[in-house]
Amino acid sequence: CYLGQTYLNGASYQGRLNETTQTGAELIGDDSSDGDAEMIVMVIDALKSTGLQEFQVELGQVEFYRGLVEEAGMDEETSNQLQELIENKNYFGVEELLTEQTMPEEQKRVFLKLPELFGDIEKIRLARSMTANKRSLQAIDRLERVQEILDSYGLGDYVSYDLGMLSKYSYYTGIIFKAYTYGTGEYLVTGGRYDKLLVQFGKNTPAVGFAIVVERLMLALSRQRIVTKVNRVEQMVLYEPGARTKAVGLAKHFRTEGQAVQLI
């Protein structure tokens, strides 16, 4: 887990802060769909703990798109252009770009459908019926497994799907997700799997994680008039180095009475 400042290299004059506070968590060394699900459970629990109830976590899978691109033999430049159009739900732009490409009409139809593949789990099942590409189907398998795990936690209703959500960050290698609520026009949480990123820092191990944008979360809480309970210190026990045992005993006494205690 971590908490710190992040600096974004975004476009100018958009009314957005270039410096934000983020808090989040990473699960390192686990490449399973169970690990994906655990991170999403943590996101949901974290948002609920602030008092939010009406929010959605949108799940995507970059490998579904990459499998289709690989099968179509599309070059990187065209793939990046198409990816941006799909993510922006620019149907006409997608159609225009595909008319310039040499590929079977069946493959073109799948790409044209991608901007529409958002909603509940039925959209994922529809996507499965649209392709026989092994890489893409493995991506669908992982999403369905994540849904099963979330359902077992009783949290399945908090998630939806968007196979047209394709991150501009190429280091993502599997599931990606963003959390939204009303009161802010931006995502509160962003995250995903990045199994090949840490090798650039000397550690070849899989990882999945997320970041909560604290300013956006606070804005949403304010606009929804949600007051978050803060645990304040009610008792402060000051002690000299040789009196630790006595101080700890006194702190335990206060805590059994339900009081928050800080030892100094």
Task: Give, region by region, the residue ranges found by the protein language model.
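Short, conserved phosphate-binding/catalytic loop or strand-edge motifs used
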Residues: N18-T23, L59-G67
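Extended alpha-helical scaffolds
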Residues: T50, F64-Y65, T78
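Short, surface-exposed recognition loops or helix-turn segments adjacent to catalytic cores
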Residues: E54-F64, L82, S160-G164
